[in-house]
């Protein structure tokens, strides 16, 4: 099993209200990939955070193996969600697999 963990910071230009909307969209879009991507065992996006947090959202996903993770990165459903609900709003991204 391979874990894929990402922390995102959203762009500073957004109000807190807009950031909440963006986080909801990220969570809904990414979690909807469950069952659509071969080898994706679980996927959770955490958006509830304390004021002391330095990240706006976190993804925690598990894959059967490294090949499944590589396939996820280019899977059309993932790319669609990432390009519409994540990448346009992100200032920084930190990943650990």
Provide a role label for each language-model segment:
Residues 1-56, 64-74, 97:
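Short S/T/G/P-rich N-terminal loop/turn motif that feeds into the first structured element of a domain
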Residues 66-93:
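C-terminal structural segments of small proteins and small subunits
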């Amino acid at each position: 099993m391979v874990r894929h963990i990402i922390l995102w910071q959203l762009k500073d230009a957004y109000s807190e209200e807009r950031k909440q909307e963006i986080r909801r969209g990220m969570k809904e879009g990414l979690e909807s990939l469950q069952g659509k991507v071969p080898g994706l065992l679980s996927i959770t996006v955490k958006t509830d955070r304390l004021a002391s947090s330095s990240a706006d959202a976190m993804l925690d996903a598990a894959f059967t193996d490294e090949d499944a993770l590589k396939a996820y990165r280019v899977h059309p459903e993932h790319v669609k969600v990432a390009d519409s609900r994540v990448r346009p709003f992100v200032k920084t991204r930190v990943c650990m697999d």
